[in-house]
């Protein structure tokens, strides 16, 4: 949120915004002070940069700025301990920010960066597959794909790349191991690239060797579900309706119990952003 609002990309920081006059203060570790000045200037953010000094705690600095005013804090973004400490210095009220709702609508520059990250990941994946997967371990495939994305211009990977071969592919968040890709395996790869903080996220499954009738059937069902879900995406539609459109294909075929995750999610500076397309999603697209 701080990066999105101010452009600052450094480590731990706190941002205070005055409701009365809209003044803002960015509290940063002294090691990031110059960086904060440069990055907030470049992003044209109107914010006072305050250096956190060793002999004064962050909560004390916040209390000095807030004074006798009340401090609204989003409890989902701070620890209970920090909340308790703040309450010892100033009047604290719990209030959820609206930043998630604001951030889910991307501007043209954000969309361009996400598209760039997706393009890098897509091309890296194509190179990976052309080299072949048979006989390689999950870790080797992970390392090679990560290298290809960075070599193609990614600032970094978007998250820890997942590679799962054979039966391990049933684990959505499997950690790559020394398991080797064998003939007849399906290899699930979940990966993404990052460009200027913005991320891409895609999952691909490659069948090594002959494709069985059952595997072909499942491929066609997933493709049909994806097509139905994409077709249902329109302005004004509730997120749960998109999930339902995709999930209906699996329900029809009696395999919905195998679909243990949501249909999709937003993406940006975080890998998972609103809206989260699940049966519980009430957000309007």
Question: Where are these predicted regions, by residue range?
Answer:
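Active-site neighborhoods and metal-handling regions in enzymes and metal-associated proteins
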Residues: 1-285
């Amino acid at each position: 949120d701080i990066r999105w609002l101010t452009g600052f990309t450094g480590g731990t920081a706190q941002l205070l915004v005055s409701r009365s006059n809209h003044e803002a203060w960015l509290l940063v570790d002294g090691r990031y002070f110059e960086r904060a000045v440069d990055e907030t200037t470049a992003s044209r953010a109107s914010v006072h940069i305050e250096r956190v000094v060793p002999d004064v705690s962050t909560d004390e600095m916040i209390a000095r700025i807030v004074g006798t005013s009340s401090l609204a804090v989003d409890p989902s973004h701070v620890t209970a301990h920090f909340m308790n400490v703040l309450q010892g210095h100033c009047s604290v009220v719990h209030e959820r920010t609206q930043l998630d709702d604001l951030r889910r609508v991307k501007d043209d520059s954000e969309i361009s960066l996400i598209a760039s990250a997706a393009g890098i990941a897509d091309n890296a994946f194509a190179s990976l597959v052309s080299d072949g997967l048979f006989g390689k371990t999950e870790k080797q495939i992970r390392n090679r794909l990560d290298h290809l994305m960075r070599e193609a211009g990614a600032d970094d990977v978007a998250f820890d790349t997942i590679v799962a071969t054979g039966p391990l592919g049933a684990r959505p968040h499997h950690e790559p191991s020394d398991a080797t890709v064998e003939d007849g395996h399906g290899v699930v790869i979940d990966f993404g690239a990052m460009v200027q903080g913005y991320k891409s996220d895609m999952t691909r499954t490659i069948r090594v060797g002959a494709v069985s009738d059952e595997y072909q059937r499942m491929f066609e069902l997933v493709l049909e579900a994806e097509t139905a879900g994409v077709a249902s995406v329109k302005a004004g539609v509730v997120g749960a309706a998109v999930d339902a459109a995709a999930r209906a294909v699996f329900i029809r075929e009696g395999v919905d119990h195998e679909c243990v995750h949501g249909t999709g999610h937003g993406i940006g500076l975080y890998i998972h952003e609103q809206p989260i397309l699940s049966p519980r999603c009430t957000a309007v697209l």
